[in-house]
Amino acid sequence: MSEAEYLTQEDFLQRSNKLQEISDLGINPYPYEFPGTSSVEEIKQEYASQTLGNSEDATNKKTPKVKISGRMVLFRSMGKNAFAQILDNDQKIQVMFNRDFSSVAGLPEDAEISPIKFIEKKLDLGDILGIEGYLFFTHSGELTILVETVTLLCKALISLPDKHAGLSDKEIRYRKRWLDLISSDEVRQTFFKRSRIIKLIRQYMDAQGFMEVETPILQNIYGGAEATPFVTTLNALHSEVFLRISLEIALKKILVGGTSRVYEIGKVFRNEGIDRTHNPEFTMIEAYAANVDYHSVMTYVENLVEYLVCALNDGSTVLTYSHLKQGPQTVDFKAPWIRMTMKDSIKTYGDVDVDLHADHELRNILKERTSLPEESYATAPRGLLITALFDELVCDKLIAPHHITDHPIETTPLCKSLRSGDADFVERFESFCLGKELCNAYSELNDPLHQRMLLEKQMEKKALDPDSEYHPIDEEFLEALCQGMPPAGGFGIGIDRLVMILTDAASIRDVLYFPAMRRLESENN
């Protein structure tokens, strides 16, 4: 439906006529306020277990009086009574309109239409109502409000999706998330959980002594990851700038400045593909702590995730999943998690001991056992061949939480080499579960001369391949390292993917209010 198409729909026209009729009665269908309300959740918490009395007690005003607002999502008329369900945030409550008791705010006493007929004929599903009335329990034990006064707070001009069919079209669900939220209890719960997860992360990080900061989204030089940036122009300075692809570099500069534990939760932008686990705009947490290495960071990460799982799951560390291609799975997030080097994981889960194979043999294995195009690894160095084998043969099998450690040096220039002296591998780990990468972490490189050398090597590769994702050298960052950055460990977690894991979501689009979508033809006109 185009932006204007709904204006000619029969339902819209009928509701618009009702809107005019309501206005003609002297009722403002869009009032300015409705103060003094309680939430449905608060009312249920306070009164659901009390003895309140029946509808007769409510009619005699002997039960507690309450005031709520919300969207009418169900309505049925039964003789002199009418029943409705009011949705407020993620909670619903039944209300009862009575022919002899209920009134309509603003309806003139001499109006030709009675209050109950106004409620039945002029109100529609989707309207937002203010309700004042008295609580009681029905014969079936349902907490209900006997309505004394109903106030129309907003006349909805477009009908709700069918109550039983809901929104089956995923395209519409993602584009018109407001309809999805109104229609689905499950969707609302997912986004309430998302909000709570972010709040819990902050609580955990603050309790661990980390300070939250904010750093620029617009940057003169992008860095901290291998990704293609969004490019824009800062008109005031007549300069090209980039939307950040990572939070890392700015946070390390703050570490140099003397803040020993620092974190940021913020938006990151990568001008790359869209799939089940990737969106060009996403939310990350990155954190850096002085005087720790990647072993300590593994403990931080697994304890953080265990804390979140327990907080959302009544103290249990076990979650059950239904959307995995391997079928239903039960996963325990209790720390400590499995720790395994990348090479060992390829041997264990991919049945390939990379130490026994030359580079050309690794290429043959990739050709025989994966669907990767040959040009993607034909000239790749050994470290990237090992990484490709891991990605193709191992990732999907990491259902239980794993920390995969000791990655090839070709995967990042920002990490310290193994302290064992093997310069081909670095103290990096990635955390996986449900076949998804959850976390990326390093023992951070703080030797400025070694850092410059590694970044210059990347620049040489970029000169040979202009389409590569290697970023330009940030001289300010190198200057900051020369000032002295303490030994540190750092991690980054994609919060959207974390929410997927904690809510059993099948796609990243299910945990983003408004995911990136292709522009509609009507939007191009």
From Swiss-Prot:
Keywords: Aminoacyl-tRNA synthetase, ATP-binding, Cytoplasm, Ligase, Magnesium, Metal-binding, Nucleotide-binding, Protein biosynthesis. GO terms for cellular component: cytosol. It is found in: Cytoplasm. Belongs to the class-II aminoacyl-tRNA synthetase family. Its cofactor is Mg(2+). Its main location: cytoplasm. Disulfide bonds: none annotated. Homodimer. This is Lysine--tRNA ligase. The keyword Protein transport does not apply. Pfam families: tRNA-synt_2, tRNA_anti-codon. One of its GO terms (molecular function) is lysine-tRNA ligase activity. InterPro entries: Aa-tRNA-synt_II (IPR004364), aa-tRNA-synth_II (IPR006195), aa-tRNA-synth_II/BPL/LPL (IPR045864), Lys-tRNA-ligase_II (IPR002313), Lys-tRNA-ligase_II_N (IPR044136), Lys-tRNA-synth_II_C (IPR018149), NA-bd_OB-fold (IPR012340), NA-bd_OB_tRNA (IPR004365). Mg(2+) 1 binds at residues 430, 437. Mg(2+) 2 binds at residue 437. Gene3D superfamilies: Bira Bifunctional Protein, Domain 2, Nucleic acid-binding proteins. PANTHER family: LYSINE--TRNA LIGASE, CHLOROPLASTIC_MITOCHONDRIAL, LYSYL-TRNA SYNTHETASE. Binds 3 Mg(2+) ions per subunit. It catalyses: tRNA(Lys) + L-lysine + ATP = L-lysyl-tRNA(Lys) + AMP + diphosphate. Coiled coil: none annotated. It comes from Chlamydia caviae (strain ATCC VR-813 / DSM 19441 / 03DC25 / GPIC) (Chlamydophila caviae). GO terms for biological process: lysyl-tRNA aminoacylation. Its EC number is 6.1.1.6.
